[in-house]
A protein has these predicted regions:
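Conserved double-stranded beta-helix
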Residues: 1-48, 53-54
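Conserved hydrophobic/aromatic beta-strand scaffold that supports enzyme active sites
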Residues: 2, 32-36, 99-101, 109-111, ...
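Activation segment
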Residues: 7, 57-58, 120-121
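Short, surface-exposed loop/helix-turn segments at secondary-structure junctions
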Residues: 18, 82-95, 127-129, 148-153
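A short beta-loop-beta micro-motif enriched in histidine and acidic residues
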Residues: 19-30, 97-98, 104, 128-129
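Glycine-rich loops and low-complexity Gly/Arg-rich segments
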Residues: 22-29, 39-41, 57-62, 71-75, ...
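Double-stranded beta-helix
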Residues: 42-117
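Non-heme Fe(II)/2-oxoglutarate
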Residues: 61-64, 106-111, 115-180
Length: 180
């Protein structure tokens, strides 16, 4: 779970990315839930490339650890260099990629697969801030997958201490398990 906060006047867009490559897991049955705690204009809201979670592509993701203007210690970093390909130029071709986003009221939610390409507009209107609660959910096909390029957040130590190894099912010993 995470809370994202941007102060009034911030004009920073969250780069296009997918969530799963950052995580210590791999699997298709994943859901991220993004819930603004304040009203959000469409231009500031999360935007998506519909259907991109079904593309069989690995893209070079943004290292969010680089976005650390205060140079804080212990910030998780990743390095996606190597066999991954660059993201397509979505911003210059938004219509071609059918990019979608919405005005959202406080408490509205959008749920999406962790492999879908998404990013934040980040263009906050005058007098507006952005506060978002985000949570991730994992399904039965999801397995532990420690990644050599790093993870953000990096739960690998916690998972290894709980006896989990790459290929194992993520169990409820450190992550709550819900039966629906």
């Amino acid at each position: 779970d995470a809370i994202f906060v941007r102060s009034e006047g911030v004009q920073f867009s969250t780069p296009w990315h997918q969530d799963e490559p950052y995580w210590s897991v791999k699997g298709f049955d994943t859901v991220s839930i993004w819930m603004p705690l304040v009203d959000v204009d469409k231009k500031s809201s999360l935007a998506f490339v519909p259907g991109s979670h079904r593309w069989d592509k690995n893209y070079i993701q943004q290292d969010f650890g680089e976005l650390n203007p205060d140079n804080e210690e212990g910030v998780d970093t990743v390095n996606f260099e190597g066999e991954w390909e660059k993201f397509p130029d979505i911003d210059s071709n938004r219509h071609e990629f059918n990019v979608i986003s919405w005005d959202m009221k406080a408490g509205d939610c959008v749920a999406f697969n962790a492999r879908i390409i998404h990013g934040g507009g980040g263009k906050l209107s005058s007098g507006r801030d952005l506060k978002v609660f985000n949570t991730q959910w994992l399904g039965k096909d999801v397995r532990v997958n420690f990644k050599p390029y790093g993870m953000d957040p990096d739960h690998s130590v916690k998972m290894k201490n709980a006896g989990m190894n790459s290929g194992d099912k993520v169990d409820g010993s450190i992550y709550p398990e819900f039966t629906i």
